[in-house]
């Protein structure tokens, strides 16, 4: 037997064909969401408060300090928030201290700071009753970047940019004359020496002393001449910078100083963030810059005077490691003192080394490091600016390297916590202005923190982020896999990111650093391709937001691949050589071959085993979760694999799902971490279990109650239904499945079914990827799904009185009310079809709705018969089904409703949809198709043992698309069905062709895995042997029921009077420009005429045509289309007197907008009608009065008798 058995959870064993021992379990797949939010609550929020506070008033006599915060219990539970359309949020209370510096008085107070949305255990947020996800954003990391560009003469120039988290950009660039310029915040350029002089190093000698002698420096110094001898060089430089930043304003050295301090050195205006400081220190650090350079002067320990490195030594990695502590310490540190006129007058500490120029052995080049400022320094420092300039000048000498902006070492991820922190910071900085003003205006004696703090800017910023940010998305809840994928999605779009139109090819392309960090396969097709990605299965964020991936460390001494796991970011990985996970190992853990496949800085080739530093932990670490669910992925073309991964996310949950016979072993983990199943939180024993709840007695005696959700509507309108897996008496451990979620079976993801599939044509019905299906799949509910739709009706107060929910609806027969209760609301369990009443509702009729005769009646008899009109909620087109649930919310019951709403009724209708012609089906290899025919079971081809085939696919769908994985799955699936086993064939480490054929042989199938098929209609065998097997097929969300649409009489557009378009508007088919050409080509004048008139916007014509058809009369000639009248009116509005004449030169009257407005005219027959009506009403009133008198008399008589 090939393969070995592996247990997945407690309910499933699979025969696995993997050969590689997994040394690391998959991390929790939604930790990118949960960990980030937890970090935000633990310290992120505190940091934001500490960034903005303390706040002082303008005279610096009062100060508001932040003390701490506390998050209380949420107002609603998760379920209540869902039902009431509320947000699942917790109140946050912040303690502030207000200090009066004049009197020394301190007031401490706790201030309510709004309700903060709380993340659920599943990594989602409930906002206004809907489940949402905050997608992580992929952005350019703050730091310093160097780039090269070739001008039109083929000369290489360099550029550099310091990009902060917030604040001004600082750029350097060289031109064709080898002069170096700098730009501050995208303004006009100035020689870089001007900025150096402004920093307090004004003499040319000082500049040469700092940077050394290079052509770029010489040329720039020559260009930067002293123009105004009245000013010092520093003052002149400051004025020149001010002129660039604030053109047209009077320039003084003082204003320039304060402007530059505000732009670069004020932590409130300029922020590199921790990640920016880390990146700058890493880039400008002398250790990386000295690597493999020849040192030009001896390095001497400043404390002992010992020579650490002799001149002429090549600084290899081992040499640098040997003096690392000195390099991080005071080795070659030089302190420069700026002059008194400088922007910043503190001493500038630099590290300075001289190396031999790589391009010219006779020249010496100076390398300046920024002496590694502390992590807490969040602004750029003069040392950073000088070190950046040094790196820039070194590039021209062949030292250092330019950066690749698409490298994942230069792109980081902003997860939920950081995005939220940014919003709170935004709100707090808006609040800050407000607080300052209130502090200054009000009386200091009586001020308390509560009085000066207005929380509205903060709550508004948070609310806006959750409600309308591009990154706050309605959760994709088609099935558990789509939920999981959505939580792990990385988007380069959104505020502060890219835009679709400006994103070029390079940003979207697969980069070698994506390996193990971002999936190279799973990305949408269409305009977002490459901009929206998915985290790879083992991907993990470090504290700076860079994606790390795990590797096994290789001991270079012994050559043993250890089980020690090291997590590396993309730029750390660049320094090492990494072997692939499928490299063969000996028993002792050394490499079996002398030469192994590996990669170094994106070069995939064979490397000697003795230079390998790390090895991949798993073959599936390259791909995302959805991609890792495709068996035989390695045999599929990447474009089809992309479609396969994306289509699994569109699978509809079926009523009795089956896990695949041929899986990858990823199904269990995906189902477990998706959040759609019920998972045991603690060890214990089941004491009670039914369909709605499970009780587990913990080992310490306490009781856990798990509620099972039944047929809840998901965001996608599918049924979110959980099924209990445990029985009373079962022992459960933490992490075990208590109930399956939708699209799960026995704790494994189960998106579809395992039908028997044959690759053969049949009467041409599977032309162009169409799918032929057996009626068995319809009858046995194999591909049946339940869909729930929510409809709501609300009663409001109108000017004419309140609307009412009632059974008494005007002009509706008793038959239409048979399923309504006494309130007029449909009963649960009623079968409804389109047009049926769900909620009976009447609205008072307005004056404007009264006809002339009714108004006359009001005038004659006073305000008697105020009518109501029927505004009931009815079942829309194509939404028939069974009423699953009704929820009623009223103010009386204390439900929170919108203002003006008195009562809200929600009705849920469930539809059971069997598979039908027009539904879309797919396999896991991008092989999608539409059901074209459902054939009776008896007519389907059958196997020699009499088993009829379930599905027939076209064999032509395989060769050109190169997704051969489906054929291998087919054969292995048939073997698994015959042997009665489930199989796991992990990606890139699955069943080889030898495993496949040996399993086929074990199952007793023929050696070519094909079979003879018999025609179900004639019983004759088909001419050729056919590939028949079991393939996992899923039903996709694109169902014909949602798309089928027909219009009879429907709504028209107000202006053009043409029918609306689209199913949602109950619109018609657009007969467009090209279709008109087709009719013109045939000369079909009458058809054209009616399309342009009766069927479109000839208002009178269409009414008359309808009348003529119903009465069987000939159809009258059409009139003028409304859109023509619109054109005439537009031309008239331009002052052109345009009229329409007929063939006799008589003016054609166009419908006027005022027509039908003259409602005050009362015609004679109207009076007659009114008289009749009045007489009838008077008669009815008289009869009613008489009847009332009679009953009163009877009652009096009875009373007398009793006495």
Swiss-Prot record:
Keywords: DNA-directed RNA polymerase, Nucleotidyltransferase, Transcription, Transferase. Residues 1174-1195 have a biased composition (Basic and acidic residues). The keyword Nucleotidyltransferase applies. InterPro entries: DNA-dir_RNA_pol_bsu_ext_1_sf, DNA-dir_RNA_pol_bsu_external_1, DNA-dir_RNA_pol_su2, DNA-dir_RNAP_su2_dom, DNA-dir_RNAP_su2_hyb_sf, RNA_pol_bsu_bac, RNA_pol_bsu_CS, RNA_pol_bsu_protrusion. Its EC number is 2.7.7.6. Pfam families: RNA_pol_Rpb2_1, RNA_pol_Rpb2_2, RNA_pol_Rpb2_3, RNA_pol_Rpb2_45, RNA_pol_Rpb2_6, RNA_pol_Rpb2_7. GO terms for molecular function: DNA binding; DNA-directed RNA polymerase activity; ribonucleoside binding. GO terms for biological process: DNA-templated transcription. The keyword Nucleotidyltransferase applies. It catalyses: RNA(n) + a ribonucleoside 5'-triphosphate = RNA(n+1) + diphosphate. PROSITE patterns: RNA_POL_BETA (PS01166). One of its GO terms (cellular component) is DNA-directed RNA polymerase complex. Residues 1174-1203 are annotated as: Disordered. Gene3D superfamilies: 2.40.50.100, 2.40.50.150, 3.90.1100.10, DNA-directed RNA polymerase, beta subunit, external 1 domain, DNA-directed RNA polymerase, subunit 2, domain 6, RNA polymerase alpha subunit dimerisation domain, RNA polymerase Rpb2, domain 2. Belongs to the RNA polymerase beta chain family. The RNAP catalytic core consists of 2 alpha, 1 beta, 1 beta' and 1 omega subunit. When a sigma factor is associated with the core the holoenzyme is formed, which can initiate transcription. DNA-dependent RNA polymerase catalyzes the transcription of DNA into RNA using the four ribonucleoside triphosphates as substrates. This is DNA-directed RNA polymerase subunit beta. The gene is rpoB.
